[in-house]
Amino acid sequence: MHCPFCGANDTKVIDSRLVAEGEQVRRRRECVACGERFTTFETAELVLPRLIKQDGTRQPFDEEKLRAGMQRALEKRPVSVERLEAALAHIKSRLRATGEREVKSLVVGELVMAELRKLDEVAYIRFASVYRRFQDLDEFREEIDRLAREPAKE
């Protein structure tokens, strides 16, 4: 690593510690050339796969768009921000676990539906009605009946 003081290429690590609940490594470094010490922090860069939209276009995963969609479905529902954030983290974890560089947006939609179903059934129906483009009351009834018949998967 380059020394931020003199620009030399040769630095040595004199101390390493886990910080941020094990999510980061803090390193104390010393420049071999000038002797100055400095601190660096390392975190794993966890890249989420790109999304393949239904029309075939590709776009980067957008966590804010995902959060906004889930918040819209959960509007005025008794679900804490902590539970929403945990659901978002679970969705991102499942996407990373695929090991794929690209996933179809349908995969994300199904993961969102599964998480919303565990959080709040009304929010699940709200999201499903938009996501699956319900056209009439019969489609709502069918989904509600299916919800009543099939237990949510944990």
Swiss-Prot record:
It comes from the Bacteria. Its cofactor is Zn(2+). Keywords: ATP-binding, DNA-binding, Metal-binding, Nucleotide-binding, Repressor, Transcription, Transcription regulation, Zinc, Zinc-finger. GO terms for biological process: negative regulation of DNA-templated transcription. Pfam families: ATP-cone (PF03477), Zn_ribbon_NrdR (PF22811). NCBIfam families: transcriptional regulator NrdR. This is Transcriptional repressor NrdR. It comes from Pseudomonas putida (strain W619). The gene is nrdR.
